[in-house]
């Protein structure tokens, strides 16, 4: 098999593995707060993940550069087995974690594989350690701390707002060309209408019942859905370029030979992430939705807003972060606001251990794959 095609196959497999583990990070709050069932939430997260992964082809060139060549000393000859070994290390670890229900970071797995395989292939002097530390390790270490703190600061503010707006919704009425608010007592008030502002609309039902309204209704649940979609989109935008970059790591290509190859690579990654998300995302979603802490609607919204804002911001600067660490830290931070006893510490312990083990485990798997692939290449 042609080396480039073999690497592309492994890239698709890693994208699939990423989907099985990472789709949960943006949708677990929908299930945990009781807004959606698993099937609907996973389908929602899958769609926006694929949108984000596809869009990253046009906005994530800095991330591609970092993971394809930014940490290897220029001028080194990259062995043919290097990229396949790196991919195998990450694939094996992420699939194992998904099977056992552990939320782990594909970014950490790739980083561990790159460093482990890089040291074996080039020695300690072959890696640009300043790039590894500043552009990869530092953002990965700081992001969960920032997420933990931001969620604990953001949620009390959102809790005040949502308590004030509890039961309030906005009805969009195209036939009346109006936006109408309905309070929990059934009172109505026009936000906007062609004929006037602030006038009661008697035709609107006294209950905020979606089935009885003459137009779609927007409430707190709608904002939670939107925040989940945004977090899924951000995840796709952040993860897809790291995976696609492996095609430029030691294959027959070091740059995209044509726009067609560029689009093909990201389209393949987006589809594989979507397939993995939809058919394999249940197990890890169950862990984050039910086994860390209980959440209400406002808490779920706070966690998703924290996740989406940090992941999108990091992507703007081309900094790789772990959606896993950010979303899990946000959920844990919000759980602590309820009190220490509200967290299931055995689950938190397992999650933290999985975080700590991911980089060395992926590094060891990449080294083993490098050795076995080198032996196979010499044999055949």
Give, region by region, the residue ranges found by the protein language model.
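Transmembrane helical segments that form the transport core of multi-pass membrane transport proteins
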Residues: 231-303, 334
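N-terminal signal-anchor module of multipass membrane proteins
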Residues: 2-55
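Alpha-helical transmembrane segments in multi-pass membrane proteins
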Residues: 7-14, 44-52, 56, 60, ...
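Juxtamembrane boundary at the C-terminal end of a transmembrane helix
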Residues: 368-380
């Amino acid at each position: 098999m042609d080396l480039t095609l073999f690497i592309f196959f492994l890239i698709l497999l890693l994208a699939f593995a990423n989907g099985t583990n990472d789709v949960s990070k943006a949708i677990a709050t929908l299930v945990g707060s009781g807004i959606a069932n698993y099937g609907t939430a996973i389908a929602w997260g899958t769609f926006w993940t694929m949108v984000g992964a596809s869009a990253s082809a046009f906005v994530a060139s800095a991330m591609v550069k970092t993971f394809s060549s930014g940490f290897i000393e220029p001028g080194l000859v990259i062995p043919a087995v290097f990229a396949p070994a790196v991919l195998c290390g990450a694939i094996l670890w992420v699939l194992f974690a998904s099977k056992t229900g552990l939320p782990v970071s594909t970014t950490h797995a790739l980083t561990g594989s790159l460093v482990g395989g890089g040291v074996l292939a080039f020695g300690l002097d072959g890696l640009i350690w300043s790039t590894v530390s500043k552009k990869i390790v530092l953002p990965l270490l700081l992001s969960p701390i920032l997420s933990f703190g931001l969620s604990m600061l953001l949620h009390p503010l959102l809790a005040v707002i949502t308590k004030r707006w509890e039961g309030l919704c906005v009805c969009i009425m195209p036939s009346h060309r109006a936006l109408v608010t309905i309070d929990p007592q059934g009172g109505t008030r026009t936000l906007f209408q062609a004929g006037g502002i602030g006038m009661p609309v008697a035709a609107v039902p006294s209950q905020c019942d979606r089935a009885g309204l003459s137009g779609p209704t927007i409430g707190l649940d709608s904002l939670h859905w939107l925040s989940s979609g945004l977090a899924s989109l951000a995840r796709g935008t952040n993860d897809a370029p790291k995976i696609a970059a492996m095609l430029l790591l030691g294959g027959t290509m070091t740059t995209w030979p044509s726009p067609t190859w560029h689009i093909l690579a990201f389209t393949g990654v987006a589809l594989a992430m979507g397939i993995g998300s939809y058919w394999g995302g249940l197990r890890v979603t169950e862990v984050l939705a039910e086994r860390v802490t209980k959440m209400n609607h406002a808490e779920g919204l706070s966690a998703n807003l924290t996740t989406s804002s940090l992941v999108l911001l990091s992507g703007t600067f081309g900094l790789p972060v772990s959606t896993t660490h950010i979303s899990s830290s946000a959920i844990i931070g919000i759980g602590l606001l309820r009190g220490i006893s509200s967290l299931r510490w055995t689950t938190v312990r397992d999650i933290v251990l999985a975080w700590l083990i991911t980089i060395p485990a992926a590094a060891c798997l990449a080294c083993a794959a490098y050795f076995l692939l080198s032996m196979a290449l010499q044999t055949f």
